[in-house]
Amino acid sequence: MIEFVKGTIDYVSPQYIVIENGGIGYQIFTPNPFIYKERSQETIFTYHHIREDAFSLYGFSTREEKALFTKLLNVTGIGPKGALAILGSGDPGAVIQAIENEDEAFLVKFPGVGKKTARQIILDLKGKLADVVPEMIENLFNHEERLEKQTAETALEEALEALRVLGYAEKEIKKVLPHLKEEIGLTTDQYVKKALQKLLK
């Protein structure tokens, strides 16, 4: 198995590149060939696809792209050309996010992906990409956690403002604030109700 090819880009076509290494030119199908420039030095991470009638190399600029490509090949109805089209048409992080969020509308935008195939991609890959592209998954979920935290902080701030409007002094509000901070994920109304329960005791 060829893990990667490091060499000089000899030729760029709409479907593939040719990279020269040790006097040998490797034809490699890539998602976006025109990101490469002829005579530039590149490292291409490769996947060797073997069929009875053909031996083909598919190449990617990162190991993460390659890993996502191999995962897509495991989906019923997705072949090398389909997986390559998905990677070529969208950012890998956006593809992963669409899978995790079950966003069929996003996935059907890719060439050759209908509703049935989009649903199959989600069924086969949701929750199974963390070990393949951990950095992308980590960034995705960290982003979601940050949004949740920001939403909770906003709800708490709105609740405190509501208490001020109701006429409660800062001293009283500060007394119940530690109790409110212990509560996670409440809405503004729920925070207000919790505060009033403490204040009216």
Swiss-Prot record:
Q: Which UniProt keywords apply?
A: Cytoplasm, DNA damage, DNA recombination, DNA repair, DNA-binding
Major localization class: cytoplasm
User: Cellular component GO terms, alphabetically?
Assistant: cytoplasm; Holliday junction helicase complex; Holliday junction resolvase complex
User: Per its UniProt record, what HAMAP family does this chain match?
Assistant: DNA_HJ_migration_RuvA
Q: What does this protein do?
A: The RuvA-RuvB-RuvC complex processes Holliday junction (HJ) DNA during genetic recombination and DNA repair, while the RuvA-RuvB complex plays an important role in the rescue of blocked DNA replication forks via replication fork reversal (RFR). RuvA specifically binds to HJ cruciform DNA, conferring on it an open structure. The RuvB hexamer acts as an ATP-dependent pump, pulling dsDNA into and through the RuvAB complex. HJ branch migration allows RuvC to scan DNA until it finds its consensus sequence, where it cleaves and resolves the cruciform DNA.
User: What family, per the record?
Assistant: Belongs to the RuvA family.
According to its record, what is known about the domains?
A: Has three domains with a flexible linker between the domains II and III and assumes an 'L' shape. Domain III is highly mobile and contacts RuvB.
Return the protein name.
Holliday junction branch migration complex subunit RuvA
Look up and give the organism this protein is from: Bacillus subtilis (strain 168)
User: What is the organism lineage in this UniProt record?
Assistant: Bacteria, Bacillati, Bacillota, Bacilli, Bacillales
